[in-house]
């Protein structure tokens, strides 16, 4: 796969180029501001590629800033995983890692300024009363009875909030805007709430925490962000973003621009829902290869280049749409087709015994990649007793079946032509061995008498094959549109199949994360659960869809 050499052309790029041309900005600075309440998923990759990519393209900067204003749900583990994921995707943030909590003292000062300008007040309505007073989309809200407190009272009460003088939920700081606004976000939104929780960076220094909409815009301004990019669900929040910056004493006024989020079929794009899958033990963890997290995709065998290419292809628009999983799979197939060495593996083994061959071992020289001589060659042992895949043999079959059938011939990949003679079965009628004869004159060449050999199957030497656990993955959810289903009920119980098979001996010393094409089976990655005595491989993606095996 060749990563796109041309810059993607989209509306945000047009905005930046116009800003630069008109002299509005001489330098571009973006930011990626995740909340550290879970592991990043493929949806975040779109934002990472956009923000860091724009900074790279325009010789600017991109900050990594953790929006750490909700201490009850945030953990240092998530911070470390997010940093690893950004670096794994191939990006580097400018300067030190930043935290919204770095600005808590400044944010507090701006809150005091809003109180002094009679643009904020301490409210003591409880949550239920506040919902009642807010009104609906068709009915205006009504003012809180605490809305008209004096500046002095509000400052005193706000300081009392900071000092821990109120219980959680007993008071909050609200902006004083317009309870009759047609935009719910502008009906006196909460700016600060009380939380007695240990903060992963600051410990117990604070018991009041700023809300996202208050923190986000000021943090952008303090960092000199020129283009604040977020997804469409924050479109209405832009009104509050601008209102805050227009009403405090701060010179920098970044602009917020929204783009469509990534919606991918048969999976989840919500850290909250993914967290629940982990909690309910539907999956083994955040890096389960079925998960759409970047750590899960990495473990499954996806490469940074394939994910960057995927983000390039889906583009940046304001139109919400559902992206088919096949679009992501196409990117990793192209990447691994070019870069993954080939190997032979049998997922559902049955013995193939060559009756007219001695027990002497033969070593075959096999290319590691059919189209890339630079990847070199390997030696593969060929013996009298082999394993082939059970699906590659039938006692009877129609003419469309191009694999091994009793009385007919097939080629063994990289080796000889064989003809099936008879089978052995156990008491239950299952085939335990297939007996055949081989043509010793057909090593990597056609029969001399002109016989046409229609099919090719793969194999491994029974004496030398290495046992391996093969994990085959399918969609995480049975429903294609996750937002319209009860996702726990839609969890696919058949999202994982485990096969006990064999791989060729050259893979005995494989390393975690190493990817291969198992010929005729798909692309596979060595899992972290592998050990010297127990190899484990994850299927990254099939060759050309689930029926690929039957096309060969």
Curated annotation (Swiss-Prot):
Under InterPro entries, the record lists: aa-tRNA-synth_I_CS, Gln-tRNA-synth, Gln/Glu-tRNA_Ligase, Gln_tRNA_ligase_bac, Glu/Gln-tRNA-synth, Glu/Gln-tRNA-synth_Ib_cat-dom, Glu/Gln-tRNA-synth_Ib_codon-bd, Glu_tRNA_lig_a-bdl
Q: 'KMSKS' region: where is this motif?
A: 268-272
Q: Which PANTHER family match?
A: GLUTAMATE--TRNA LIGASE, GLUTAMINE-TRNA LIGASE
Which GO terms fall under molecular function for this chain's record?
A: ATP binding; glutamine-tRNA ligase activity
Fetch the NCBIfam families from UniProt.
Answer: glnS (TIGR00440), PRK14703.1 (NF011291)
Q: What is its EC number?
A: 6.1.1.18
Q: Name one GO biological process term.
A: glutamyl-tRNA aminoacylation
The residues listed in the UniProt record as binding L-glutamine, with positions renumbered to this chain, are: 67, 212
Q: Which reaction does it catalyse?
A: tRNA(Gln) + L-glutamine + ATP = L-glutaminyl-tRNA(Gln) + AMP + diphosphate
The motif 'HIGH' region: which residues?
A: 34-44
Q: Show the taxonomic lineage.
A: Bacteria, Pseudomonadati, Pseudomonadota, Gammaproteobacteria, Enterobacterales
The keyword 4Fe-4S is annotated on this UniProt entry? no
**Can you say what this protein is called?**
Glutamine--tRNA ligase
Question: Could you describe the subunit structure of this protein?
Answer: Monomer.
One Pfam short name: tRNA-synt_1c_C2
Cell compartments where the protein resides:
Cytoplasm
List of residues binding ATP = 35-37, 41-47, 231, 261-262, 269-271
What family classification does the UniProt entry report for this protein? Belongs to the class-I aminoacyl-tRNA synthetase family.
What cellular-component terms does GO give this entry?
A: cytosol
Sorted alphabetically, which keywords does the UniProt record give? Aminoacyl-tRNA synthetase, ATP-binding, Cytoplasm, Ligase, Nucleotide-binding, Protein biosynthesis
């Amino acid at each position: 796969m060749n990563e796109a050499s041309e810059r993607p052309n989209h509306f945000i790029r047009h905005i930046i180029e116009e800003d630069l041309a008109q002299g509005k900005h001489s330098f571009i600075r973006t930011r990626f501001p995740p909340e550290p309440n879970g592991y990043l998923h493929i949806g975040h990759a779109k934002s990472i590629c956009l923000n860091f990519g724009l900074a790279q393209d325009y010789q600017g900067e991109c900050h990594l800033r953790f929006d750490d204003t909700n201490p009850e749900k945030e953990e240092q583990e998530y911070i470390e995983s997010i940093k690893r994921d950004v670096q794994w995707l191939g990006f580097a943030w400018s300067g030190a890692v930043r935290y919204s909590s770095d600005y808590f003292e400044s944010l507090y000062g701006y809150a005091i300024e809003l109180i002094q300008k009679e643009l904020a007040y301490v409210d003591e309505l409880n949550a239920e009363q506040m919902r009642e007073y807010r009104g609906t989309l068709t009915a205006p809200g009504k003012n809180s009875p605490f809305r008209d407190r004096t500046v002095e009272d509000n400052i005193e009460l706000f300081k009392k909030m900071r000092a821990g003088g109120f219980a959680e939920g007993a008071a909050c700081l609200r902006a004083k805007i317009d309870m009759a606004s047609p935009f719910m976000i502008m009906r006196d939104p909460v700016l600060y709430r009380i939380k007695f929780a240990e903060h992963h960076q600051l410990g117990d220094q604070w018991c009041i925490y700023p809300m996202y909409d208050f923190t986000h815009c000021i943090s952008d301004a303090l960092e000199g962000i020129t283009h604040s990019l977020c997804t469409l669900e924050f479109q209405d929040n832009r009104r509050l973003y601008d209102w805050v910056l227009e009403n405090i004493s701060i010179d920098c006024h970044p602009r917020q621009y929204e783009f469509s989020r990534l919606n991918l079929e048969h999976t989840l794009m919500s850290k909250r829902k993914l967290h629940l899958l982990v909690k309910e033990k539907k999956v083994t963890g955040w890096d389960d290869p079925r998960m759409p997290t970047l750590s899960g995709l990495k473990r499954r065998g996806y490469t940074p280049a394939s994910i960057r290419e995927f983000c390039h292809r889906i583009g940046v628009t304001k139109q919400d749409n559902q992206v088919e999983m096949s679009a992501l799979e196409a990117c990793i197939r192209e990447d691994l087709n070019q870069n993954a060495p080939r190997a032979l593996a049998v997922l559902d083994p049955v013995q193939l015994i060559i009756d007219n061959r001695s027990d002497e071992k033969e070593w075959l020289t096999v290319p590691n990649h059919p189209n890339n001589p630079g990847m070199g060659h390997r030696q593969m042992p060929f013996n009298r007793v082999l394993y082939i895949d059970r699906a590659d043999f039938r006692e009877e079959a129609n003419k469309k079946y191009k694999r091994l059938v009793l009385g007919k011939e097939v080629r063994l990949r990289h080796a000889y032509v064989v003809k099936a003679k008879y089978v052995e079965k156990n008491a239950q009628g299952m085939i335990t061995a297939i007996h055949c004869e081989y043509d010793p004159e057909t090593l990597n060449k056609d029969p001399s008498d002109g016989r046409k050999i229609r099919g090719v199957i793969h194999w491994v030497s029974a004496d030398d094959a290495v046992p391996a656990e093969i994990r085959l993955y399918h969609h995480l959810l049975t429903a294609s549109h996750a937002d319209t289903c009860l996702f726990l009920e839609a969890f696919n119980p058949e999202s994982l199949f485990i096969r006990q098979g064999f791989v060729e001996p050259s893979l005995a010393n494989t390393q975690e994360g190493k990817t291969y094409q198992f010929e005729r089976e798909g692309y596979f990655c060595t899992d972290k659960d592998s050990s010297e005595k127990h190899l484990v491989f994850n299927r990254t993606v099939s060759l050309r869809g689930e029926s690929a095996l039957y096309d060969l």
